[in-house]
Structure formats: structure tokens, C-alpha cells
């Protein structure tokens, strides 16, 4: 009886050492995926071949008339060849839509691809030239007199309400000007091209003195930014969105790309933590709950301070949930001893569950105990 008990226990422990082949340690998700793969990988070509063979056996090949089955008996009796009532057309229709004598003509007479054009291809209400849209005497003119591709332009091509220049949109004296006086491509700009409500510079949107400034004073591409380019309500830095002193900060004080975060980057209403949504410290929603702990980040930084760079470091744990860090771009040249939490980007990393390791250890320990009992009893 004693030997039987030892044999049973040893069998259980040996089976438990192979979790991928035994019942209680089987990963059900992998098993389900395996079954799904086996089911989804059925070769459908054999089914298609069987279907084609069945159709051929019934005389339903391509190009045959299904009504021939009912008329076979009559044909054999009469000995005459039956003529189809509606002969099939094997040729495709030409791509001409309302065109006489030419392909792909849309209401065109005598030419291809002409849309309401007389005597030329691809003319849209054009007289004597191709691709003219309400143009007289030139191709591709849209309400233009004497030039191609002019849109309400006098004397030049591609002018949209422009006088004397091509491609001018409400521009005086220059091409491609949109409500600009004296320069090309200016949108409500005075004296420069491509200026949108900008004075003295190109591509300025409500910017004074610089190009591409959107409500920015003194710099290009500034959106409500004072003194820097591309600043959105930012003071002193580029691309800052309601951020003071840093670029690309969204309601963040002192850090870039922070969303209502104080002291950290990309924090959503988080105080003292990075990327925390409505969370102070640990937080109460999913984002806050998944935010890395500041203490653990500091401890991990002390371990990898000498090797941390702009690439992600390995996870701080070998199983379970840990953290990983990397330098920000603006701190790439900092000395390792000068690094702080504000110079780092943190991320939560999840490794394999530790249950598998514990199972192997416990099973091995149980097997050792069993062997000791078997040898010394």
C-alpha cells in the first residue's frame, strides 16, 4: 500500500512538470487558438474543385444556357437546331458614356473623353481646345480669356480672380495670391507671398513680422506664442500648448507635452506623475492605476543610471509588472549623475506571469521530497 501511494504521488508530480501537456496547467487561450487555427485552415480548394466537378456533371459549364436542359427532348425529336431568343453578347461595352463614335466620351461629339466639348477631346464647355472649362481659345481654361487653365483670370493661365498674373486668387499683380496685394500666394497678406493675415512676411497667419505665424509676434508658425515659432499659447518656447517654458506642453508647467500635468510630461491632470489620467500618485482610473510608481522608478534609475540612454532599458523585473525608462531628447547629452525623473520617460512593462516559475520550483521540490521518502523508508 505504501509503495502504491508513493507511485501515485510521483506520477502526479511528474505529470505536473509538463504543464503544456496536462489538464490543470493547460493554457486555455492557446488551446482555443489552436482549435481555431485547425478549423480555419481547412483547404477550400478541394471544396471548390468538387463544386466545379458537380457543376460540370450537371451540364452547367460557363457559357451554357440553363434552358437547354428542358429543351433537350424537343431538340432530339424535331432534329432541328433551336435558336436562342436572346443571343448572348460576349463583347464588353465600350466606356463611352453618351459619346457618339468615340470611347469614353461624355456628351462629346467626335472626340474621346470630351465633356460637352465641340471638336476636341476632354473639353468641358471649351471652344476649339482640349480640356477647356468655359475657356475661349485655350485649353483647360476655366472662365479665362486667352490663356489656359485660367479661373476667372484675365490674360494669364490658372488665375483665379487675378489681374495680370497666373494662378492668382484675388491677388493684384502676382501669381497664386489669395487676397494678397503685391505678392504671390498671399492670403490677406500685405507685401509678402503666402501670408494669411500676415504683415510683411510670407505664410503668416495673423503674424506680425514673421512667416507662417498664427497669432504669433516675432516668430514664424507661432500660434498665440510670444517670441518662439509654432507655439500654441506658449510663452518662450516653440509648439507649446498652454505650456510655460517648455515646447509642446498642453497645460503643463515646466515640461513638454504635458496635458494638465505639473512637473511631468504627457500627464493628464496628474500631479507628480507622468501620463497619469486624473490621478494623483496612484490614481483611480485605468491610466492612473497603470502609472509607474515614483519610488520604484527612482530605485530602478539608481541601478541603470550609468547605462540609460535614449532607447528603452530592459524591464525592471523578470516576471510580472515592472517599469522601463529612457532619456528624453533634451536630456540626451546630460551626465548620468545629473539625471532626474524629469529627464526620463517611463513606461509600464509586463513580463510573463510568475506562476509558471513557481509551479516548476514547487514540483521539483516535491519530487525531491518524494525521492528522499522513497529511499529512506
UniProtKB/Swiss-Prot annotation:
Question: Which regions are flagged for Gly residues bias?
Answer: 274-283
Q: Where is the composition biased (Low complexity)?
A: 236-273, 284-293
What domain of life?
Eukaryota
PROSITE patterns given for it? TSP1
This chain is glycosylated at: 318
List the propeptide region positions: 355-377
Which InterPro entries does the protein's record reference?
Answer: Crcmsprzoite (IPR003067), TSP1_rpt (IPR000884), TSP1_rpt_sf (IPR036383)
Ranges of the sequence repeats in the UniProt entry: 95-103, 104-112, 113-121, 122-130, 131-139, 140-148, 149-157, 158-166, 167-175, 176-184, 185-193, 194-202, 203-211, 212-220, 221-229, 230-238, 239-247, 248-256, 257-265, 266-274
Region listing for Disordered, in residue ranges:
51-294
User: Which membrane topology describes this protein?
Assistant: Lipid-anchor; GPI-anchor
Q: Where is this region: Region I?
A: 91-95
Subcellular location, in the record's words?
Answer: Cell membrane; Cytoplasm
**Family assignment from sequence similarity:** Belongs to the plasmodium circumsporozoite protein family.
Q: What is known of its domains?
A: The N-terminus is involved in the initial binding to heparan sulfate proteoglycans (HSPGs) on the surface of host hepatocytes. The N-terminus masks the TSP type-1 (TSR) domain which maintains the sporozoites in a migratory state, enabling them to complete their journey to the salivary gland in the mosquito vector and then to the host liver. The unmasking of the TSP type-1 (TSR) domain when the sporozoite interacts with the host hepatocyte also protects sporozoites from host antibodies. The TSP type-1 (TSR) domain is required for sporozoite development and invasion. CSP has two conformational states, an adhesive conformation in which the TSP type-1 (TSR) domain is exposed and a nonadhesive conformation in which the TSR is masked by the N-terminus. TSR-exposed conformation occurs during sporozoite development in the oocyst in the mosquito vector and during host hepatocyte invasion. TSR-masked conformation occurs during sporozoite migration through the hemolymph to salivary glands in the mosquito vector and in the host dermis.
Q: What does this protein do?
A: Essential sporozoite protein. In the mosquito vector, required for sporozoite development in the oocyst, migration through the vector hemolymph and entry into the vector salivary glands. In the vertebrate host, required for sporozoite migration through the host dermis and infection of host hepatocytes. Binds to highly sulfated heparan sulfate proteoglycans (HSPGs) on the surface of host hepatocytes.
| Protein name in the entry | Circumsporozoite protein
Q: Which gene encodes it?
A: CSP
Amino acid at each position: 500500500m505504501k509503495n502504491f501511494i508513493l507511485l501515485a504521488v510521483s506520477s502526479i508530480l511528474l505529470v505536473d512538470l509538463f504543464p503544456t501537456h496536462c489538464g490543470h496547467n493547460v493554457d486555455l487561450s492557446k488551446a482555443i487558438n489552436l482549435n481555431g487555427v485547425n478549423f480555419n485552415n481547412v483547404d477550400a480548394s478541394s471544396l471548390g474543385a468538387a463544386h466545379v466537378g458537380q457543376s460540370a456533371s450537371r451540364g452547367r459549364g460557363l457559357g451554357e444556357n440553363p434552358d437547354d436542359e428542358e429543351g433537350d427532348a424537343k431538340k432530339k425529336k424535331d432534329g432541328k437546331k433551336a435558336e436562342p431568343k436572346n443571343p448572348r453578347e460576349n463583347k464588353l461595352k465600350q466606356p463611352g458614356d453618351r459619346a457618339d463614335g468615340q470611347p469614353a466620351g461624355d456628351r462629346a461629339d467626335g472626340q474621346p473623353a470630351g465633356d460637352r466639348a465641340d471638336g476636341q477631346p476632354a473639353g468641358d464647355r471649351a471652344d476649339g481646345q482640349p480640356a477647356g472649362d468655359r475657356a475661349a481659345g485655350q485649353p483647360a481654361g476655366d472662365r479665362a480669356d486667352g490663356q489656359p487653365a485660367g479661373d476667372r483670370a484675365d490674360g494669364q493661365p490658372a488665375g483665379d480672380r487675378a489681374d495680370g498674373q497666373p494662378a492668382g486668387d484675388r491677388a493684384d499683380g502676382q501669381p497664386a495670391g489669395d487676397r494678397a496685394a503685391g505678392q504671390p500666394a498671399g492670403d490677406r497678406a500685405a507685401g509678402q507671398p503666402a501670408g494669411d493675415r500676415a504683415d510683411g512676411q510670407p505664410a503668416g497667419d495673423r503674424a506680425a513680422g514673421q512667416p507662417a505665424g498664427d497669432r504669433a509676434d516675432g516668430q514664424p508658425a507661432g500660434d498665440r506664442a510670444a517670441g518662439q515659432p509654432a507655439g500654441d499659447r506658449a510663452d518662450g518656447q516653440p509648439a507649446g500648448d498652454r505650456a510655460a517654458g517648455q515646447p509642446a506642453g498642453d497645460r503643463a508647467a515646466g515640461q513638454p507635452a504635458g496635458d494638465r500635468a505639473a512637473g511631468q510630461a504627457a500627464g493628464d491632470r496628474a500631479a507628480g506623475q507622468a501620463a497619469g489620467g486624473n490621478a494623483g500618485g496612484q490614481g483611480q482610473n485605468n491610466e492612473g492605476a497603470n502609472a509607474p510608481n515614483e519610488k520604484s522608478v527612482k530605485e530602478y534609475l539608481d541601478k541603470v543610471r550609468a547605462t540609460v540612454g535614449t532607447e528603452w532599458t530592459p524591464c525592471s523585473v523578470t516576471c510580472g509588472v515592472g517599469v522601463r525608462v529612457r532619456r528624453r531628447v533634451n536630456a540626451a547629452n546630460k551626465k548620468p549623475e545629473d539625471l532626474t525623473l524629469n529627464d526620463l520617460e517611463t513606461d509600464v512593462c509586463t513580463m510573463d506571469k510568475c506562476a509558471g516559475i513557481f509551479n516548476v520550483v514547487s514540483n521539483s521540490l516535491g519530487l525531491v521530497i518524494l525521492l528522499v521518502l522513497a529511499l529512506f523508508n
